[in-house]
């Protein structure tokens, strides 16, 4: 293909456009139709051989499994049952702990936590259990939890979980809110599911540490990004991201649902109050830390998907929050759907929902599709079934000590594709490669990251005031 042909192709791909999705946020059929279109565009990025989405980080596939499970629950859609099950098992690795060998030299505690959360989603959805000779979804979650909690580090900052899992990884010196938020959420979910005090004890321990160190401000309930161990966590990165507060919010909702304690309701209300004021503009969800500067990287475009799911989860666990959270789901879903009018399909979703004018922002990919999908799917949250517990589950296999002292011996050497963050020119090129893949080519396989995990945070020291 000559340069002229490539230029025409790319022009056609990017600017074909289409009228924004005609979503009626009050009509089930309209919501269902919109979700089906979004799902179709999302699955264009699926690669069955790697059991992951291309042109995205490994953790994004884990988070997206949660979205597919919500699709299964809310729309009774069994189309992707085998895909979900296969991906959750394959990516768990031979240790069944979401520490697979192909991610071992790139593993963040947040990555592992995202996959564990997806396995927990499966357990709580009473999702078809794995092969009877394997472990239950609960046991996979417990194994990952034990791996992560085993890395709790009291040698610096008085405790906490580091961002990266192992000392040789860039970012190991950083204690990140997201890693601790995920461990907190897993603790609270496991406490409710199993009714075992070891998990609620962990949830209280993590909450106390994150508030003591200042990651969660108990006056404003702002959630800051984290701090480095070189300063003993005394200098906070003031960046605020929607997914951090969303993950904490869900954990608090589980603890309130499980314990009924007033203190957890107060904490939940504080997080909701800050989340609904800081991360919305004209009642539309946004991440001002990067969207304000038009500078969102490939991690950050997925954050609102997790944030929107956190609203749905919170409503399920604390129904009194419905009147506060659901109207914001509605306005955000409507705006997200208006951004889904680009790319080759004419329905690819962008990320700048706050534009809210039916024009596309030229961004697309797995993360953008995931985020918009979660916003629209949460419109059906009031019809979600009750979240299961071990007592109501069809699979009662549980092992709270699994993988707590297991030596890793994972022989699976398949390499997952991780696209390294680039400058804007590089990002455009990767977008071009992704588009070619969608049309059936395989250029994506050549774009493997060889330098390891790239930090997902924005510029240090730059923060939007609360």
UniProtKB/Swiss-Prot annotation:
Keywords: Glycoprotein, Glycosidase, Hydrolase, Signal. One of its GO terms (biological process) is carbohydrate catabolic process. InterPro entries: 6-hairpin_glycosidase_sf, Glyco_hydro_76, Mannan-1_6-alpha_mannosidase. Residues 1-20 form the signal peptide. The keyword Flavoprotein does not apply. One of its GO terms (cellular component) is external side of plasma membrane. Glycans are attached at residues 47, 77, 131, 195, 217, 232, 257, 357, 396, 399, 409, 412. One of its GO terms (molecular function) is mannan endo-1,6-alpha-mannosidase activity. Pfam families: Glyco_hydro_76 (PF03663). Its EC number is 3.2.1.101. It catalyses: Random hydrolysis of (1->6)-alpha-D-mannosidic linkages in unbranched (1->6)-mannans. It comes from the Eukaryota. The keyword Hydrolase applies. SUPFAM superfamilies: Six-hairpin glycosidases (SSF48208). PANTHER family: MANNAN ENDO-1,6-ALPHA-MANNOSIDASE C1198.06C-RELATED, MANNAN ENDO-1,6-ALPHA-MANNOSIDASE DCW1. This is Putative mannan endo-1,6-alpha-mannosidase C1198.06c. It comes from Schizosaccharomyces pombe (strain 972 / ATCC 24843) (Fission yeast).
């Amino acid at each position: 293909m000559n340069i002229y042909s490539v230029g025409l192709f790319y022009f056609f791909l990017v600017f074909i456009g289409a009228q924004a999705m005609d979503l009626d946020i009050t009509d089930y059929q309209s919501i269902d139709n919109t979700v089906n279109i979004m799902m179709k565009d999302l699955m264009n990025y699926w690669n069955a051989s790697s059991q992951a989405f291309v042109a995205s980080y490994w953790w994004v596939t884990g988070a997206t499994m949660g979205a597919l499970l919500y699709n299964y629950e809310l729309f009774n859609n069994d189309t992707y049952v085998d895909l979900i099950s296969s991906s959750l098992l394959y990516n768990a690795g031979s240790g069944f702990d979401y520490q697979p060998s192909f991610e071992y030299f790139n593993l963040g505690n947040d990555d592992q936590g995202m996959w564990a959360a997806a396995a927990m989603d499966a357990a709580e959805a009473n999702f078809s259990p794995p092969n009877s000779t394997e472990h239950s979804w609960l046991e996979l979650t417990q194994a990952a939890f034990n791996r992560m909690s085993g890395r709790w580090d009291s040698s610096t900052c008085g405790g906490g979980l580091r961002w990266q899992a192992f000392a040789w990884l860039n970012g190991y010196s950083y204690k990140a809110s997201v890693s601790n938020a995920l461990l907190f959420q897993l603790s609270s979910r496991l406490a409710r599911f199993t009714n075992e005090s070891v998990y609620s004890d962990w949830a209280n321990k993590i909450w106390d540490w994150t508030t003591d160190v200042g990651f969660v401000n108990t006056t404003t309930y702002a959630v800051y990004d984290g701090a480095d161990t070189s300063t003993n966590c005394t200098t906070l990165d003031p960046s605020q991201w929607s997914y951090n507060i969303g993950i904490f919010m869900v954990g608090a909702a589980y603890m309130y649902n499980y314990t009924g304690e007033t203190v957890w309701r107060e904490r939940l209300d504080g997080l909701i109050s800050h989340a609904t004021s800081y991360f919305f503009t004209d009642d539309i969800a946004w991440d001002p830390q990067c969207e304000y500067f038009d500078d969102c990287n490939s991690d950050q475009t997925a954050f609102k998907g997790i944030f929107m799911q956190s609203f749905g989860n919170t409503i399920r666990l604390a129904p009194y929050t419905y009147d506060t959270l659901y109207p914001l789901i509605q306005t955000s879903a409507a705006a997200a759907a208006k951004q889904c009018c680009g790319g080759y399909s004419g329905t690819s979703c962008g990320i700048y929902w706050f534009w809210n004018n039916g024009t596309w922002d030229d961004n697309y990919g797995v993360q953008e599709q995931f985020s918009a999908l979660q916003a629209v799917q949460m419109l059906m949250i009031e019809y979600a079934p009750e979240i299961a517990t071990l007592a109501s589950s069809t699979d009662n296999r549980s092992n709270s000590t699994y993988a707590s002292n297991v030596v890793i011996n994972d022989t699976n050497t398949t390499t997952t594709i991780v696209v390294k963050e680039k400058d804007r020119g590089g990002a455009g090129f990767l977008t071009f490669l992704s588009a070619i893949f969608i049309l059936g080519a395989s250029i994506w396989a050549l774009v493997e990251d060889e330098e390891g995990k790239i930090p997902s945070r924005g510029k240090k020291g730059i923060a939007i005031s609360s």
